[in-house]
């Protein structure tokens, strides 16, 4: 009985899952575990973000946010991402299998495969929801401008390479 009360108390203090995006009858969810600054320079602050990742399905209309009635399947262990909070070089790196993939983000002109990274970036760096109606103005108010580098590249050590991402062959 004591372990049940402890588990309920821990769950009550945990942040609510955040909706990342929904597509093709499936939604991606994230539940933050930690968000720690690990290095700062004049170019920006590198953050190590740990979160549980999950998925749910829907039939008709996707949910607009978390509701306790939504069954979410959570992956284990928690996923780690590196986020370079920078007005001039915003970027996010995530693990894909055994590789690290980094997305350099032009937050005003995102290809579809960068949207989840932009959502994670804005939440990690500013606590801002990318889905808000005035997102372009909100990003300008935060100091971002259109036209920053946009691309995807494979890297080996995100904690080192995020400040100077190599160029991809397509850039």
Residue ranges of model-derived segments:
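Sec-dependent N-terminal signal peptides
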Residues: 1-11
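N-terminal secretory-pathway/extracellular module detecting exported/lumenal segments
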Residues: 13-171
